[in-house]
Amino acid sequence: MSRTIVVDHLARIEGHAGITVVLGGDGVERVDFNVTEGIRLFEGLVCGRHCIDVPAIVSRICAICSHGHTITALSALEQALHVTVSAQTRTLRDLAYQGANIESHALHVFCLALPDLLGHPSVVSLAGANPAAVGMALRLKKLGNTIQEIVGGRAVHPVNYVIGGFGRLPSTDDLLQLKAALEAGLNDCAAALALLRTIALPAFVNEPVRCAALIPRDEAFFFGDAVRLSDGFEVPVDKYLTLTNERAVAHSHAKFSLHDGRSYMVGALARLSLHGDRIQGAARDAWNAVGLTLPSTNIVANNLAQFVELVYSVEHALEIVTALLAQGIADEPPVRVEMRAGEGTAATEVPRGTLFHRYVLDADGCVVAADVITPTAQNFSNVEDQLRAAVRDGAGETDEVLRSRLEIVARAYDPCVSCSVHAIRVL
């Protein structure tokens, strides 16, 4: 006799999704991660539009990831237009990515995931029991927003990034403000570490995690030109379709990805598993203190990996700002752009994993084809594999216990469902 476990609405994630699991006499018969978010046709929206309009449009794919979508789109368009940006522009974009990482990871680790690990139903309940922890989390989130606002013009849906550079460059006063805020942020990271090092991860998950991430370019941890999987497969960014292999499934408004017939995960856990040797300083100390062991067979460890990256981003952002103050901001205009036909593909590591943007332009600079593949869409197949692992030995557990397990595992990926349903799909 079969038994069905249903999570109608997965709380504490971005967007709308649910879970259906069918258990039978022979184990887990079916697992569906049901993405019910309304379909949003961004790739169709940009076709026919001039390339100058594209970054502002695709930033609306997601508010939390808006800077990542904007900069990844700019990088792809600059490749198509044969535009090479300055070292200063690359540095400032790197700084913006640190801000995005701080904001997103602070929100997820402390407000969305931590209630699970401390036995609270919500961040509101957690705030009542531990207001200092939630206050610290919100200060870190504000720090990330401040960085993005200073570099991108707005914390959400930036207006300052343009093809070839920036509309306005940060002032010395802006950088001094950031430096003080980042120094305070390191103190908040230390307070957060004191809390996280006391938390034990749930033991019901024990399943190997196949990881994928960009191979970092020089010291830029979130930028690269090729993707590596933990089983050794490597692919240049412009051949990304050989990795993602998107497919439609009946139970989801988003597409799912498989590589070589198997799922993989992207995100903080994948980045540290593949390239964690680049993490040093306070972030390495935090890694050791929380007891993060990689490679991990516990997907919930992604929450700890996100915290390690958060510390890295605060520390690295402070290094960038200190260097910019020492050398000064060069008053450089954006690179001059001449419209031409071309094709460009770019990938960056946004908080939830590897993000791909591809655009084909005509001779006037208008978009004739577009493709965006988000981290969460790549993760969906792996989510289902890990959900299966979480309940396969749970025949003797109550429905309530199994629902809790399913929610904890799904939330560990920090899914951004609005990003995942960006694509055109024929229904």
Enumerate the predicted regions with their spans.
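Active-site catalytic microenvironments in core metabolic enzymes, especially phosphate/sugar-handling
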Residues: 365
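Active-site bordering "gate/hinge" segments
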Residues: 1-354, 374-427
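A translation/RNA-centric and nucleic-acid-associated enzymatic feature enriched
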Residues: 352, 357-359, 369
